[in-house]
C-alpha cells in the first residue's frame, strides 16, 4: 500500500495475500514500512512523479509483499528543498515509524539528511541523489546508494569527448550547486588529463529564468560546451541554446540528466545531436530493460526515465535484501548489510554490484539524441562497462584529492 499526503491522495498498489506458515509469521510482525520522499511539487515535480511511479511499479509486480510480509510505502513531498527533505525524513521516522527511508533528488538534500539517519541508525537508500562524498571521503554507514556518484558518469565523458568527439577547447555551464560542481569537475579532470583544455566555467542559479547573459558571455574560441542541467532547467537551457544560434556551431555535450527522457519529451529538434553520458537510456537493448520500459509506458503512458528506473532498481534492492534476511528488517544492521551485499545481473540498467563504500559499480552509456519513429530518444553509441565511482584511479589516491567543487579543479586555462 502507498499512502500519500495532502493533495496527492491515497494510491493503492496491488497486494497479494500471502499464504502458508511463513506468511503467518510475517503477518504477526506486521507490514514493512518504507518511507519514500520525492519532490512532487516545484521545478522537479515531474522527476518526483517518475520516482514514485517507478518505485511503486516494482512493488506492484512483486505483489506488494516480500518474505511473507506486506510492504507499505508512505510517500512525502519534500518540494525539492533540502531543509524540507530533512523535515519529512524526521516525520517518516518519528511519526510513521518506518523501518527504512529512501528518496530525494538534489545532492544537497543527500548531504542534509545524512547526519540524521546516521545518528538514528536508519537504513537509508539513495535511489537518485548523487553527492560524491556520501560514499567517498565522508562515507555514511547507514546509507546505501543504488544510483551513482555525481562524477561517476562524467569521468567517462571527459575521456569520450577528447578521444572520440575530437574536442579540444571546452567551456562549461552548469547548475551552481553540489551536483553541478561534482559532475562538471569529473568531466574537467579527465578531459584535461586526456590533453584537452577547459577555458571557461560558468555557473547558473537553480532559479535562473534567463540564460541570455550566460550565453552572451561564452568565449568564441571554444569547440564545445559541457553542461550539467536537470528538470525544467534542461528544457529552458536547450531552447536558449538554439535561440542564441549556437546549435550546429558549437558541440553541446553534458550530463545525462540534461536530456533525460522526462525532459526530452518537451524538447524539439534543437536537442538533436546532443551527446550525454549516464547510467541509463530508455532504449537500452537488454531483456530486462525491454520488459521494464514496456511495463512502465503501458501503465503510465509515458517513457521510462532515469528517475523511474533508479527508483525501480532501489525497490529491487529492498526486495532482494529483505528476502535474504527472511523479512527481519527490525534488525537494522543485518538489514543494512543485506542491502550492501545485493548484486543484480539483470537490472534494466545492466549488471550492478556494490563497492566497499556502498556505491554501485555499473555501466556508463554515451548517448546521442536522435529522432526515431517520430520520437526523440537517447541512442546508446558507446558503453563504458563496470565503471567505478573512482574511474580508473587508485581509490586511496583519489580520496586524497579535494572534493570536486565550484573551484576545484581550478580553471588553469581560463584567462
Question: PLM features: residue spans?
Answer:
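Extracytosolic ligand-binding ectodomains
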Residues: 3, 8-13, 25-415
Amino acid at each position: 500500500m502507498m499512502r500519500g499526503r495532502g493533495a496527492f491522495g491515497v494510491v493503492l498498489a496491488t497486494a497479494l495475500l500471502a499464504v502458508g506458515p511463513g506468511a503467518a509469521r510475517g503477518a504477526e510482525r506486521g507490514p514493512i514500512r518504507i518511507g519514500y520522499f520525492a519532490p512532487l511539487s516545484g521545478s522537479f515535480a515531474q522527476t518526483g512523479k517518475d520516482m514514485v511511479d517507478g518505485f511503486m511499479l516494482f512493488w506492484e509486480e512483486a505483489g506488494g509483499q516480500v518474505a511473507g510480509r506486506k510492504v507499505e510505502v508512505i510517500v512525502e513531498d519534500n518540494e525539492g528543498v533540502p531543509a524540507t527533505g530533512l523535515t519529512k525524513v524526521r516525520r517518516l521516522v518519528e511519526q510513521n515509524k518506518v523501518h527504512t527511508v529512501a528518496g530525494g533528488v538534489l545532492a544537497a538534500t543527500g548531504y542534509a539528511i545524512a547526519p540524521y539517519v546516521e545518528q538514528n541508525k536508519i537504513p537509508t537508500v539513495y535511489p537518485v541523489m548523487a553527492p560524491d562524498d556520501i560514499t567517498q571521503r565522508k562515507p555514511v554507514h547507514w546509507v546505501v546508494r543504488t544510483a551513482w556518484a555525481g562524477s561517476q558518469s562524467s569521468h567517462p565523458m571527459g575521456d569520450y569527448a577528447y578521444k572520440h568527439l575530437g574536442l579540444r577547447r571546452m567551456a562549461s555551464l552548469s547548475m551552481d550547486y553540489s551536483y553541478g560542481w561534482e559532475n562538471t569537475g569529473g568531466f574537467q579532470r579527465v578531459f584535461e588529463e586526456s590533453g584537452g583544455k577547459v577555458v571557461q566555467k560558468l555557473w547558473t542559479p537553480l532559479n535562473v529564468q534567463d540564460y541570455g547573459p550566460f550565453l552572451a558571455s561564452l568565449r568564441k574560441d571554444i569547440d564545445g560546451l559541457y553542461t550539467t542541467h536537470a528538470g525544467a532547467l534542461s528544457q529552458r537551457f536547450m531552447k536558449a541554446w538554439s535561440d542564441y544560434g549556437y546549435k550546429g556551431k558549437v558541440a553541446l555535450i553534458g550530463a545525462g540528466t540534461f536530456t533525460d527522457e522526462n525532459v526530452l519529451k518537451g524538447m524539439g529538434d534543437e536537442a538533436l545531436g546532443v551527446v550525454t553520458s549516464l547510467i541509463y537510456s530508455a532504449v537500452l537493448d537488454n531483456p530486462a530493460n525491454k520488459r521494464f520500459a514496456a511495463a512502465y509506458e503501458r501503465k503510465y503512458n509515458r517513457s521510462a526515465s532515469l528517475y523511474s528506473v533508479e527508483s525501480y532498481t532501489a525497490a529491487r534492492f529492498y526486495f532482494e535484501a529483505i528476502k535474504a534476511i527472511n523479512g527481519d528488517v527490525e534488525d537494522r544492521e543485518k538489514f543494512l548489510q543485506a542491502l550492501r551485499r545485493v548484486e543484480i545481473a539483470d537490472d534494466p540498467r545492466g549488471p550492478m554490484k556494490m563497492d566497499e563504500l556502498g556505491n554501485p559499480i555499473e555501466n556508463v552509456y554515451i548517448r546521442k539524441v536522435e529522432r526515431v519513429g517520430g520520437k526523440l530518444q537517447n541512442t546508446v553509441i558507446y558503453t563504458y562497462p563496470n565503471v567505478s565511482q573512482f574511474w580508473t584511479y587508485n581509490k586511496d589516491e583519489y580520496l586524497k584529492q579535494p572534493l570536486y567543487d565550484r573551484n576545484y579543479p581550478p580553471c588553469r586555462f581560463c584567462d
